[in-house]
């Protein structure tokens, strides 16, 4: 049992690390190649992120569920799919993996391993967009898990890709991602003083979606 849990935790750390390497690395590459064309840079970053998400969920889903995100793990806890110990270990693994992924991306592009971001993302509209993005992410997962489990990977990748464009914050929707991206002063970074507000909005959005879907689409109980 301990070995199985250890594998799940390592899968969460490894998957989150590769996700952040893809997000931050593609952001750096996109900004360098696109020059001053921010729309083109964001499009490239979106495609890379969506593709990485799809691949990583398909890879690690059978091992750990491929949460890569504390709000997804909290939703699973509220749904009684995991327990408190598993939740705590998942969250620790996700944050550690996310930071490692950012450090890797910075290093691969010959940047300081850690550089605090100066990219300000303050304002009520940014917090609202993170609430909406996080609510939508958990909404998509909750709906697919109940009736279309095999569609989770493509649905999540598609949703996050879309949310990059319909939210002014470009849809962080992940506390581990938010914390880690504050350590890269690049295209996808976030100033450290904006992190707390983002994380609170993300958790509120995730919990709200979980509670709503427990009523809207109750899980089928197998006799």
Give the label of every model feature segment:
Residues 1-223:
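Membrane-interface helix-loop junctions and terminal tails of multi-pass membrane proteins
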